[in-house]
Each structure stands twice: as structure tokens, then as C-alpha cells.
């Protein structure tokens, strides 16, 4: 992997985690491409870009590396947040999470990852592990298939996940299956991009930009963002397979959002590549993912204290609540990114 490509991947990771944090604060950097319409698909896409085919013949090594890089740190953080949650419950009277037991500690992470509210964004980590291991085995099965046939199979997986989620009951296990089908498509897309498109075709021409913007304008006709309860536009919630009435729009907005992210990196690379803080964000996406809600909680507690408001006020809202968002959203964002990085 040459340095320029490695730097671009790191900046892309930084952008993806910035979109996650901004999404949890209910604002968007790219007004036409809101984060909840594509940011997690972007992470899966990046994982596909980084997938190495040498592991097709070394499954044990691949799983060992993924356990070490994803799951080991996950359960260390999970233990930490179990302690934090217990302490906060004693201090504030609010237990932010599910009951403490072995099932919720070891099994729930692989079902929905919401055993502790303060670390619930980490559901993505266990899902990424499931998706990447599944992708490895599927690639082993499909290694003799043509690129066209593989592309058809993965595309059918991605586009059929949403309809299936509406036909069958979303049991905990079936929810994992739906998320895995949806995410596999974007892992494959990232891998396909690196193998077949990157370095061979220029997909960032003015004509393609125009096509993407026109498509996104059409997709906005399916926007539900006319009521605050619906979030920040074109959103879907992958962890719960919450796609509302949409069938293919979430897949399409994920594709347009990923393309725009790649385009953004292409046109800003020469400026961003030398900014140390951007590099650090890209290198610390795991820790930012794990800790940003806790940092926001602490910021809220400090603001409440400074305003003479009891911490019990925080207990009456969900984990994503921030104090006076009209004035404080960007303060939360800047402080959270600095502290977690």
C-alpha cells in the first residue's frame, strides 16, 4: 500500500467517524448527504477496500487478527463501561443499560450491542467482525466465479435485505442476518472498487458529479425530515433494521454518500494530508466510536452544573440528549472530537 493511498484511506476513516459523531449530534457537514444516510455503509466500504485476498487461504490467521483488533478491545471497553454505568447509577440514580449478567455481557454484543447506553455505538464493531468473517468465507466459496456473477450475488444480498426485513419478524438473530446481508454488499463494493476501478478509471469527472447530484436530488423526494422525530434527513437505522417505508432508497443513498466521500477526499487530499489532527482522528476511529457518547455525557454534566441544574435532569432524556442544542451543538462536537482523539 503506497503512502498516498494509505493517507487517503486514513482521511476517509476520519471523515467517516466525524460523520458518526455529527450524526449523533443531529447536524450534517454535507447538507445534501446527511450522515445517517450512508456513514456506516462508508465504514463497511472502507473495510472492503482494506481486505487482503491472501487471507482466503489462511482463515485461522484472519480470524485471529480480527479477534485481536476488534473483539479484544471491544470487551475491554465493555468491562470499563460496565463499571462506569454502575458508578453513574450510584451517583445519579439512573442505570444506563441492560441488566448486568453474562448473557448481556457476552451474547448481546453480537445481537444488538446496546447492553450499555454509553458505549452503544460500538455495536458496529461486533457487526463488522461478523460481516468480515462472513465475507471471507463467501469469497472462498465464490473464488471460481466470474466478477459479474459475484457482483450479482452481492448486489442481490444488499438490495433484498430491506424487503426481507419487512416480510419476516425481526428476531434478534434475523436482525443480525439482515444487517450482515446489507453490509456485505458494501464490503464487496469497497473490494471491487480497489480491484477494478481505483487506478483504472476516473469516476470523479464533472459529468459523474452532476449525475450523482441529480440522483441525490431525486432521492430527497423520499426524505422524511419534516418532523424532528425523523432525525436529519434520508436516515435509516441499520442496527435495528429501521428503514421505515423505504425499499431501495437506503442502498442508493449509501452509494451516493460513499461516492461523494471519495470525491471529497480526492479534492481535499493535498490540503488535509498535512493536518496532524486529521491524521490522528483517522488513526483513532475505534476509540472515538467507543467514547464519544460518554464524553458528551460529561460535557452535559458540566454544563448542567454551571447552570445550577441538577444532574437528575439528564436522567429524563435519552443517551443522545445534549443541553440547549441550538447554542451548544458545535461546542459539543469540537470538544468531543478533541477529547476522544
Functional labels for PLM-detected ranges:
Residues 1-341:
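Alpha-helical transmembrane segments and their immediate juxtamembrane cytosolic regions
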Amino acid at each position: 500500500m503506497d503512502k498516498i493511498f494509505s493517507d487517503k484511506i486514513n482521511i476517509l476513516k476520519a471523515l467517516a467517524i466525524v460523520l458518526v459523531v455529527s450524526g449523533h449530534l443531529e447536524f450534517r457537514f454535507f447538507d445534501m448527504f446527511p450522515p445517517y444516510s450512508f456513514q456506516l455503509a462508508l465504514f463497511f466500504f472502507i473495510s472492503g477496500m482494506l481486505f487482503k485476498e491472501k487471507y482466503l487461504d489462511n482463515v485461522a490467521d484472519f480470524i485471529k487478527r480480527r479477534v485481536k483488533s476488534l473483539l479484544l478491545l471491544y470487551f475491554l471497553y465493555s468491562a470499563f463501561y460496565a463499571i462506569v454505568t454502575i458508578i453513574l447509577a450510584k451517583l445519579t440514580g439512573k442505570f444506563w443499560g441492560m441488566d448486568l449478567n453474562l448473557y448481556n455481557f457476552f451474547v448481546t454484543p453480537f445481537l444488538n450491542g446496546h447492553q450499555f447506553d454509553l458505549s452503544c455505538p460500538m455495536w458496529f464493531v461486533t457487526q463488522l467482525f461478523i460481516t468480515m468473517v462472513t465475507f471471507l468465507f463467501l469469497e472462498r466459496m465464490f473464488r471460481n466465479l466470474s466478477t459479474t456473477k459475484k457482483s450479482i450475488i452481492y448486489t442481490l444480498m444488499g438490495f433484498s435485505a430491506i424487503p426481507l426485513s419487512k416480510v419476516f419478524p425481526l428476531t434478534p438473530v434475523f436482525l443480525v442476518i439482515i444487517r450482515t446481508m446489507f453490509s456485505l454488499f458494501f464490503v464487496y463494493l469497497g473490494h471491487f472498487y480497489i480491484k477494478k476501478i481505483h487506478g483504472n478509471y476516473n469516476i470523479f469527472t464533472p459529468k459523474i458529479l452532476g449525475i450523482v447530484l441529480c440522483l441525490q436530488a431525486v432521492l430527497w423526494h423520499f426524505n422524511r425530515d419534516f418532523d424532528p422525530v425523523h432525525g436529519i434527513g434520508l436516515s435509516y437505522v441499520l442496527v435495528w433494521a429501521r428503514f421505515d417505508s423505504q425499499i431501495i432508497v437506503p442502498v442508493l443513498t449509501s452509494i451516493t454518500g460513499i461516492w461523494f466521500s471519495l470525491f471529497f477526499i480526492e479534492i481535499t487530499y493535498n490540503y488535509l494530508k498535512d493536518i496532524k489532527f486529521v491524521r490522528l482522528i483517522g488513526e483513532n476511529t475505534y476509540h472515538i466510536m467507543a467514547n464519544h457518547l460518554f464524553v458528551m455525557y460529561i460535557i452535559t454534566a458540566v454544563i448542567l452544573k454551571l447552570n445550577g441544574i441538577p444532574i437528575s435532569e439528564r436522567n429524563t432524556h435519552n443517551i443522545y440528549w445534549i443541553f440547549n442544542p441550538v447554542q451548544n451543538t458545535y461546542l459539543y462536537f469540537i470538544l468531543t472530537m478533541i477529547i476522544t482523539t
